[in-house]
Amino acid sequence: MKQLLYKNIKIAYTDTGKGTAVILLHGFLENKTMWKAFVPELAKRNRIITIDLLGHGDTECLGYVHSMEDNADMVHAVLQELKIRKAAIIGHSMGGYVALAFAELYAEMMKGIVLLNSTSRADSAERKTNRGRAIKAVKQNYTAFVRLSIANLFSEKNREILLEEIENTRAEALKTPLQGIVASLEGMKIRKDREVILHFAAYPMLLILGKQDPVLNYEENATQIENTKVELVNFPDGHMSHIENTEELTKVLVGFLKKV
């Protein structure tokens, strides 16, 4: 693991392999370890950078609201440190929101985007209300909130099957400080709609969705790519394709990265 001092806080990242730079961004309540099953394969022909987002993993909190733009600026600082001029970004869930914020702020640096169990759309009014409820809940009972949140990301069938994987994911999630959780919920709540990027990006884009995703409705989110050149891949399970569909996802990512 490497560290960078950014705005007086520590940013943690890893840097493996050679070739086209590919940035892997985890989701809410996750950290860079979520990618460990993928790095060896992806690093065979690419330079793979995994980064802990603000208030997650070994990266410290920057404030009380971590906007997607704040995270994108931090990712940019890591790329500057590594003298990387262009990169593809693969973002899981919240990591996808950060990838799109980065694409808007630093368009000239983009080589491709994969939105994994993610969306280009802003929160609906209902989602914003739910984020507010989540902030209240995590402040009242941190452990119960985290444990329940993680289980609810898997398809119903996998909640019974992937017990060990769910426990491991919970253990990583419980390393996330309360401030980091609240700041991310606040940041996601106010994020901009960036569907326009799907229509006008001059680089390859891929949207990967789970048919049984309990968080992002499949039918609703698949409509984002209508009248775009964005490719859509679907898996039969939930919001955690990196755990629920590891082998298939590896193949899809390897195939996509050959195009960037």
Regions found by a protein language model. Name each.
Residues 85-124:
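Conserved hydrolase catalytic core segment
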Residues 58, 100, 119-126, 156-157, ...:
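A short beta-to-alpha transition loop/helix N-cap that caps and shapes the active-site region
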Residues 122-129, 140-200:
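Conserved alpha/beta-hydrolase catalytic His-Asp/Glu region
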Residues 70-87:
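Conserved acidic catalytic loop of the alpha/beta-hydrolase fold
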Residues 238-250:
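Catalytic histidine-centered segment of alpha/beta-hydrolase-like enzymes
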Residues 9-64:
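Conserved HGGG/HGGXW glycine-rich cap/lid loop of the alpha/beta-hydrolase fold
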Residues 1-22, 43-46, 84-85, 151, ...:
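Alpha/beta-hydrolase fold catalytic core
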Residues 200-237:
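Conserved loop-alpha-helix segment in the C-terminal half of the alpha/beta-hydrolase fold
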